[in-house]
Amino acid sequence: MRTCYTGQVCRDHLGQTVTLYGWVNRRRDHGGVIFIDLRDRTGLAQIVFDPDNAGAFGTAERLRNEFCVRVTGLVRERPQGTTNAELASGEVEVLCRDVEILNPSVTPPFQLDDDNLSETTRLTHRVLDLRRPQMQRNLMLRYRVSIEVRKFLDQLGFIDIETPMLTKSTPEGARDYLVPSRVNAGHFFALPQSPQLFKQMLMVSGFDRYYQITKCFRDEDLRADRQPEFTQIDCETSFLTETEIRAVFESMIRHVFKVVQNVDLPDPFPIMTWTEAMARFGSDKPDMRVNLEFTDVADIMRDVDFKVFASAATTQGSRVVALRVPGGGELSRSEIDAYTQFVGIYGAKGLAYIKVNDVAKGREGLQSPIVKNLHDAALAELVKRTGAQDGDIIFFGADRAKVVNDALGALRVKIGHSEFGKKTGLFSGGWRPLWVVDFPMFEYDEEEGRYTAAHHPFTSPKDGHEDFLETDPSQAFAKAYDMVLNGWEIGGGSVRIHREEVQSKVFRALKIGPDEAREKFGFLLDALQYGAPPHGGIAFGLDRIVTMMTGADSIRDVIAFPKTQRAQDLLTQAPSSVDDKQLRELHIRLRNTEVK
């Protein structure tokens, strides 16, 4: 029986006989004495094989990397000069008395300490990839986060309740993953994008504090921070105000970071409205470590000769902003060209700029191809409003508001995170949480000619905004809130609609007629008529939080068995084709039988 884990062997075990299990990380033959580094999920221990023990030594000669073994031996101090300060077990070694090969290994396709492996190789051989110490640390940290979340919520009286994985497809949000029903021909379940409606049903049922750590599914195009199946810390409460809900879950995140990372997050978190965040940073999830922000200059540019600025300044739905970069005058032409190309990704047609060489000289102290198209009053007000000083550069965005927000918002972050930004103090580092609140309830879809829900259609309007649902949905703001950390949305929630008549108004604003609403959401509308309590909640992305804590490059590095950006599992080769018999049982016929 194992006496302790390999990485836990230390001076406390001196003189003791221990039994260890693990894998051969490395084998070394030093002049008749054989050493192996034995590895398990806790770390490494050095095992010594003396030729005087012929049986153990003979077995050691056959050991190779990744053999699974059991070792029994005496813990002793390492000889002077051979200690390894990088290992917890680095002051001791185990003199092997007995070793058993539990299972040999074929030659692995890569060395576990190879840091230059392609993601395809790593995901195809995920079993071996997960043996790598960094991956094991990532998953152990993920486990610790989950445990601390559960501890915190349990102490506050939250109940862990499971909700269905086979549910009903709804029209809002991303595409559903559909599951055909064998016993109900022509009908389909959907895998849940979130437990949203079920947790609201639980509130109506009287379970006033609910949570679960659960899988959710969205059939959408993937990025580094997205997976088709992801894990959500899902929570809902009754009888709490928006402020009280935020306070509970802010405390939870503060607790988790303190216990798991020994990080003290601010108390309380700053709060910013969506309107302010978009105006200052062009983003509803601003990275507050970057010490740059927008200055609106549309009013200055209405009557200038530069058509790009003047047109945007006088067109509804457009904006003209300036982004002053202190010390940015030192940026080279090639660096500015690279930034110009970068903002093009977000739809910007160019990147105008002005270098401020000498404020005292007025126009003559400004360097830019566009200066000649701006009159003296505009230039003077621009310098004054942005607070520009000698040696600065001012970048401009002038276009539809979405293009400006996306392009200049991304540029702000890119400059802040650059070597230049870090060198000049534009990036402060650390952990900078933020609540963004008061989101618009709706977004207008130009293609469909109707409003869509900005979050989801069950979010309550702010007090006094209910009438806008019928008169002007664009003016309706929601009791919605996102928790943002270092430029990432790690959690989002809202106060929910708990009155049937308000929910029906929202459906009408979304052009969901009574028949469609009854067909798709009849169970919700009915439930709201039975004394549904005021309620609200939040959901956190566990994968994203752990990615940030570990500093991993991709969310796939904190998930045991993730999918690729093509939503494929390279380990099991899923998704795969199925045979005709299975399709017939599901009442499905493929229109194109040629499977790629």
Swiss-Prot record:
Provide the site residues for: Important for tRNA non-discrimination.
30, 81
Gene Ontology MF, one: ATP binding
- The EC number of this protein is 6.1.1.23
InterPro entries membership: Aa-tRNA-synt_II, aa-tRNA-synth_II, aa-tRNA-synth_II/BPL/LPL, Asp-tRNA-ligase_1, Asp-tRNA-ligase_1_N, Asp/Asn-tRNA-synth_IIb, AspRS_core, GAD-like_sf
Reactions catalysed, as given in the entry: tRNA(Asx) + L-aspartate + ATP = L-aspartyl-tRNA(Asx) + AMP + diphosphate
Q: Does S-adenosyl-L-methionine count among this protein's keywords?
A: no
- The UniProt record gives the binding positions of ATP as 218-220, 227, 489, 541-544
* Keywords from the UniProt entry: Aminoacyl-tRNA synthetase, ATP-binding, Cytoplasm, Ligase, Nucleotide-binding, Protein biosynthesis
Q: How does it assemble?
A: Homodimer.
> Which family does the record claim for this protein?
Belongs to the class-II aminoacyl-tRNA synthetase family. Type 1 subfamily.
Give the PANTHER family listed for this entry: ASPARTATE--TRNA LIGASE, MITOCHONDRIAL, ASPARTYL/LYSYL-TRNA SYNTHETASE
| Name of this protein | Aspartate--tRNA(Asp/Asn) ligase
